């Protein structure tokens, strides 16, 4: 506004310090006004003249993507221009209608499916509406509709994802106060003096900020009154009323524009990442110290100097404290940085939340590890018909699964059983992401021996899972904000495994293994509490897994202590990726994120031992290592004891 104011995380191998590369976004395209202009008409922030010292929000986003953002005049993909509006009627030289249509025309009306787009416009349209009260609503409506139409044009042309920030509140900028003062007769010299006074005050919250503004108006009223107290009071009231009216009108127009655009954006499907910069601005002004700012009503550049030509070494530049504003309308580099952090946090949030899909599988694997130890033990003993067995097991790595089970030998060669497993985990699988997992796995299983050497085992299992205290951290300059939620999930599936024991010696056998496992996982969608700009909601997650396994094992029967070893080669036939739909809480739009392609081939090595303590008491233990499966911990172990009656 020239005239106006990031993939698989943790177990999914996503680097959350940058924008996820689960979808290979390899370029960034930007359309907008001076908030986004990388040099077409200027760079509107402190020390932004040559673009080497200060970065805009979109430069930071490009950096997270691993690319350099270059303005379109130099052949790059940043088409934004200072002073641009959404419609040509308000600025026929610089507008996003021409920016978007020109871009599409030069690319055969095809957008980049692997490209990330930013469309941020509206501040100058609001400014035009303020200057034309009679046509204000018409201007706001037409501009908001035009902006949303341009976004849909990009999506319809194949754009992979479009970031659409809300217009920040013009009514909260220093320009409003200076406009009221100028209208009241203040000269440039007067404004420079007032600017110095305003800059001297720390504005620690919104009330303090308003007190500073009222204090300035009161002092002016006193200065022009000539000692007449009544005149001073009247002048002060006129200035305060004028400021309140103009600021309120500007804020209402901004809210109206943002609401209209959001409604229009939501009318069609599309991958739209809405980021509420307007709400973020209000949050910063309400508590600036939290975000590293000391003044939100003054600005760093000298009075009358546009941010596009402002240098920190210039005479009149105020480096005494961190300011929110560079000039009377444009943000400082620090403010741009916080916008980029916020935007990247929204983009990366789904990849953190998708960790829960894989987390669903952890208690199931833990329970089945204990079951496998029990079944291995049963295959190596002569279990008489009518024998009742009970066992308890523990498995884990970074989590804990306790199992209690019982089985019954209904025939000489057929055994049936059931077990219940309790899972507990306090997990932080990625930076600034934590959850407490609690769940129960219910399993029914059976073992059939045939022709003395052949065996088939099968199981059916169901997981009931609760995720409490899901905490997502968002770093905003010096402040770590946390969003909280809870949800639930379940998983059900089954396995069938077969082998044939081949004697090598009287105490050693070997066996090929074939297994098919199927699981269906579900995590309920949830909404983070609160109405912060960063609070989001996430859709349900579903994932089908079908794994075929070939392997070989070696078993011993030495008596009291019987070691065994096994190697398995696994192939995933089910879903290779999973998706989630997400959005900030304050929008009607949403976007879909897709995980990285999951490993389709991996190996699993297991060594273990079962022990015969007495005739009716035994124990078992094993340790397994996954190789090539980043979705699961590299090592896990299981141990248990059993008794028979």
UniProtKB/Swiss-Prot annotation:
Its main location: secreted. The gene is lip-1. Its EC number is 3.1.1.3. GO terms for cellular component: extracellular region; outer membrane. The active site is at 34 (nucleophile), 327, 330. It comes from Photorhabdus luminescens (Xenorhabdus luminescens). This is Lipase 1. SMART domains: Autotransporter. CDD domains: Triacylglycerol_lipase_like (cd01847). One of its GO terms (biological process) is lipid catabolic process. It is an enzyme of class 3 (hydrolase). The keyword Nuclease does not apply. GO terms for molecular function: triacylglycerol lipase activity. NCBIfam families: autotrans_barl (TIGR01414). Belongs to the 'GDSL' lipolytic enzyme family. It holds the Pfam family Lipase_GDSL.
